[in-house]
């Protein structure tokens, strides 16, 4: 948490930044309001050093010069040197019982401004009120009106918009007509409050404030007006104009030395960039605002922390989001900022929703709406109602959704409009959910017409939902065209993201209508029902493992000698879109006896489609919606983990998922490659029961692939085929490299590290697997380090084995890592991006750790937010990983049997099946054998002796 005290900028430092000693030194203004404005102007025009030096000289020559003292105090406050400001201002304040004059009233305003900058809100409120009364007593309309103007913004946040507007009415009545700067400030603050209230007129008010501010040469007020205009342009769906205006606000407030306003403008621009998906630029602005806000005050810090929370949510990093939002709530509550506190509650509701705490999310939104309504912030009330509407739609609570849509429309119809809220789109969602696709199509027409009037092209969501409506109406050609346009638009958006993390975030499942694959499942199912299997499969495949497929393509391209040229290398590194495999191409690539089972699921009760593909044909089956299978899958997995009798759940899910597969396949198919979709990413298909009572593992070898395209690419990596068996050239020694029982780092930065249990069998397991093949090595304890992993040559390793802990955060990449020993300049925490940067040429990587294959529930079909995907991208042809934490001894036994069969030359999937069947027939519970699953090519033979050279081992030699 940030301390409420703020580090001051030393006056010499400020002078060094904005000095201009060669300019003519001005005279001291004759009124206190003009003195304070002159100090602000001197900073904005970079004459602060000369002006302050002149005023200090006047005070030294005449210690009774109260105007010079007031000006020097103002310079100190503007430099955030509050101690110096207080020492200069104290002699100017009215003594008890004395009649105040104008200078005393403005001195009181200075103390209030100082308190406000430090966000001591109660002190600032009472001091501005006292200053207003002192201005009245001194018959100084500028002091009275100036104090009331500044008090109005505080009261607007703490007592409601109407209270603030009433104070501005009073201020306007007493401000002299020639006090242009304070009149401009009053207009700018009125524009802010009107914008919050949601009624029209904020833009013209801000324009008028800008005109007066320019006349008064008041850079700070100019910046405030630009900021309001930017917010107004964002409200009416003109984000490009808003970005320009926020940029002007940032520049003018920085020039004015107003760090509070500067940080606020950075926060607003960061908010805009975040809403446009420009997460890298947004985070840069927000972190810059946070740094400035550390000096400027708690209000800015609170809002900036909140927006950093939103950035973390956009990256599906819910833990990071919670941390920022908790800090935001503390800061905003301590500042009594009711708007900010309520907005932070709505953000926290988003996190609660993401982790399926629906009751908690709704409770927070109700409280936030009440608080915002009491404060008169109708614009944010509308936003909160729309958020409640979205959640009601996602829960299929049609009565609540209808109620919230009506309330939102009522808010806009009473003139309190936030034009950026597309209620027609939500009307379409409600119509789709209640079985009225034609009404949905009409609502989408209205939505797109409104967007066209604003100069915007159709959004991905509009196009995808139109495809869904057309599919439900049986207009399949139109549905295909609309979905194709939606996907093309989304891929352009994804390609524009700056980093892998941002591209993955764009693909992340948000749990509501922001899911990037909305509507796809409905269209796929409609096409499959109509017999358009090829089109249905092609659309489904385009939703899967896009970032992983692109990463693999980039890695392959870099191996091409032509990429030695800088321009070719740059093109390979920046390539984003790789064409997925077609149905015909996949069938041609399938080995004998192999079937691919490809699932497509949706949200909002959309149907699930299962494609079963062999060399000879394709069939498609419609199974229950994924929404109805989330809880059965969870109950089965939890039952397996607890060693409960999960046969009833395995039988029930088998009837839904396994039976159609078995009925579609003849006896000649013995190998399944499953391409899962949420919620099946964590489901061990091995344990599902077939109609004849057998488990699937008893009939099939089962492996998994993130997508059909990734599976085909991994087959190509195997260098060719001889029947069903990949053939590898024996290029040097190829053996097993095992890492086991690494030391724990003293400080991991991962909260869950300290809770992980010891792995007493890990060292023995690593030694044992290293003995299954010649030319192998086990690195244990301190030697099982991240530094060794990164520095060794891994191209000569056929099997890379990790008997160590891992932390997999299903909600985000930042909390996911493989844990090795620290040392050699490395912390021992190997994160996904570090794994994907390795150069691996292994047939198999084994992650014999806890839940290393877990895919985030928020990751949708992109899935695999664990450690599997980065290892595949780095060059592995197969990855064996665990779905849940397994007993250490049971895991060692299963791994031993697995390696024994690999050493006999069995293909990877067959070897794993044999090891599992031995455990099953020996009476082991499914918990002890079903967790370990294989992702990738099932046919590699990593330990075929004939493939191993007799030359000395090099796999373990550091480079």
Please provide the spans of the model-predicted regions.
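Alpha-helical solenoid repeat scaffolds used for protein-protein interaction
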Residues: 307, 330, 346-353, 357-359, ...
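Amphipathic alpha-helical segments of tetratricopeptide repeats
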Residues: 93-94, 132-136, 169-175, 207-214, ...
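N-terminal leader/linker segments that initiate helical-solenoid repeat arrays
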Residues: 23-71, 78-83, 87, 102-106
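Residue-level detector of the short coil/turn that links helix A to helix B
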Residues: 46, 80, 119, 159, ...
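Catalytic cores of enzymes
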Residues: 534, 572-959
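TPR/Sel1-like alpha-solenoid repeat signature
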Residues: 72-76, 108-115, 127, 144-155, ...
